[in-house]
Every structure is written in structure tokens, then in C-alpha cells.
Amino acid sequence: MKPLIGITTDLTEGPKQFLHDAYIRAIIQAGGVPLLVPAGVGQDVKRIEESLDGLVLSGGDDVDPYLFGEEPHPQIGKVTPERDEMEMALARQFLSADKPILGICRGMQLLNIVCGGTVYQDLTAQHVEPLIQHKQQAAKSHASHAVTLTKDSILHRLAARNEIRVNSFHHQAVRDVASPFVVTGQSTDGVIEAMESTKHRFVLGVQWHPEELHASGDLCSQKIFEVFIKNCSNL
């Protein structure tokens, strides 16, 4: 039986929630059945977790800095407290149940915050080292910069090489990494691009958008979703 995969949705202005189709297609093509999980269901996260085999924390708006003990930086973008509340509760539930999680962009940052870590509210203003471009102007399917992978990590095993190229659409990033996560990918300017849990069966976070590269035929991105679905199938 194909595993049922929850994917969190984003909030827009007005009474709408949405999800880019690339997430859905990537899960289907990897062998899973996608189910959208909207904001506003925080009180039912246990029931949701029990119904699902895996969770994708999708990209989107900035996470409220209050959740990691900071005041808002002048350069912080839009925050959506209702989404933050639900996803924090859902992530905790999945971590407690040791069910597979794939955190993408904002989703990786949120995983780190859930476990006690912090993020840069704005890379340009807060990162010490000179930065490469992290908000590319090229198409979403274009891999714009390099990421160096940690040997023997999930991504290193999938890629079978020390470096991959990824797309980039963010102005925030993981800052202080929380236990049980370890850094498994960095860009040339030192920005954390990937992390994985040393405690759980499969919890992986990536700062880029593999669902967009998946659609363009990128093999590493396809393998990310395939190994995620495989772990969701082995519950």
C-alpha cells in the first residue's frame, strides 16, 4: 500500500490556503499519496499524525522570531502565527512518534526551532561572512549555487559525491543548530543548507527546493523524495 504523506499548506491574504503543485507531483512520482494539511488544525495533530505515514513541512513565510526568543528584526518578512502554531505542534508530534519528516526551506528552519535552535531573521543583515546570492533571479528549476555535503550523511549517500548544485529562494537560514540535528550541507559562504537528525529514523531538512528541481529531472532531488517515501513505507 502506498504511504499517505501530509504536506503543510501556506496562507495567503484573504481566505485562502495553497500549495505549489511541485510538492504534490514529487510525492506522487516517488510513490506516495499526498494529503494537504492546512493551518488551523493544531488541536488535532495527534489524530493527523496517526493517520499519516510521513510529513513534508513546506516552504513559505518567515517563522515568528518570538518562537526562538527574539524580537522582530527590521528586515523580517511576513509571519503567519496560525501556521506556525499548527506546524510546531505537528512537527513535535511526528518527532515524538519517530515518523519520517522532510523539511523544505522554511520547513527546515521550523524543525530547528522546534528543537530549540535559532535562525537568521535576515541573512544580509545578520550573517558575518560575505554572502553569495540566496534569492536567485533565475527560474525555480535552475540550480544556482553549490552545496558541500558531509561524508556519510543521507544526502552524501544519495548524491554519491561531495558537492551538489541547488536552487535558492530564501533570506533566512538556520543559525544555531539544535540537538539532535547535525549539519550535513553548507554553501561556500558557510550558510547551512542541510541537516539531519541523529536520533530519529529519518528526519531531513534542506534549505533549497528539491520539489522544483525534481520536476526538471535532477537525480539527487528525485532520490531525496524516493528515500523519504521508502522510509515512510517501512513503518
What are these regions (language model features)?
Residues M1-I104, N112-V114, Y120, T124-L158, ...:
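N-terminal beta1-alpha1 cap of cysteine-dependent amidohydrolase-like domains
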Residues S168:
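Short basic/aromatic active-site micro-motif
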Residues M108:
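The feature captures the ABC ATPase H-loop/switch
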